[in-house]
Amino acid sequence: FGTPGRLTDHLDKGNFSAEHVKYLVIDEFDKCLEMGFQDEMGRLIASLPYLERHFLLSATEAEEIPRFVHMGRVETIDYRMDEEQVPERIRIYQVKSPQKDKLETLAQLLLSLGDESSIVFLNYRDSVERTNEFLRSRGFATSAFHGGLEQHEREDALYKFSNGSANIFVSTDLGARGLDIPDIDNIIHYHLPECEDSYIHRVGRTARWEATGKAFFLLGPSEDIPSYVDAEVEDYEIPSDLPAPAKPRMATIYIGKGKKDKISKGDIVGYLCKIGQLQSSEIGKIDVKDRYAYVAVSRTKLKQVLKLTAGQKIKGIKTVIEEVR
């Protein structure tokens, strides 16, 4: 399992032999093409001369298979179910903005949703950055996610949202597919989806595994609900009396050591309880990578943890411990 670039790097270094690799599965193949990964996929396929089968998994139907895949006879298997566009357990709303710039209306909508988890979808990277900065300036706990970020920045953003340190995820359509984040309450279309497939993938982030969810179209003065939306759309009235932005219960810290430094989840819990003086109930999700780790801790104890662990070693190793903002 790995990205095309990472797998090619392993092959170049001789970490495993291509001789015995008979099958290649590329997940989200259409999305890889859309994001410009043709060169990486082409190099990987060229590095695997003994392939007998290529499996290209896609949520959309390809007009043609790119030549670099070197496919022979192509057989298409369609597993899509003939079912309704959006499950009935998702309620669809429209919210009218009096201005073309909808940021103020977005802020009011998010205030009305309280501490519920929401993904705000936009169509452009710079729009994600602008919207995220605006919401943060208003006191919201957000994560920004798009393809222009470095890998570690995307990991930071995704981890904060998945562990509850940020309850608002501001993203391009990159966040509409391939992210395994359960229990998302709301989908907000700040920008209208560019096509029906985009709409379906966005809305599919909520109401998973029989849960319920809500999706909101944020409409400017000249915008209307797209014609491909076949569900009933209700008007959503934002209350006049709104609370302050909800602060998530957890915050995320970064620890600059990981698996290859012989650091385990148990080591981290012990360290934070002993040195950081936390109770185990004040520690949330822990994700240990090769060279670093993310940990969710109670937001009310964040300053305490950072102060008490400053300059302290974990398992006799010096490290950096800081908040992921």
Q: What is the role of each PLM region?
A:
Residues 88-136:
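Conserved interdomain hinge at the start of the Helicase C-terminal
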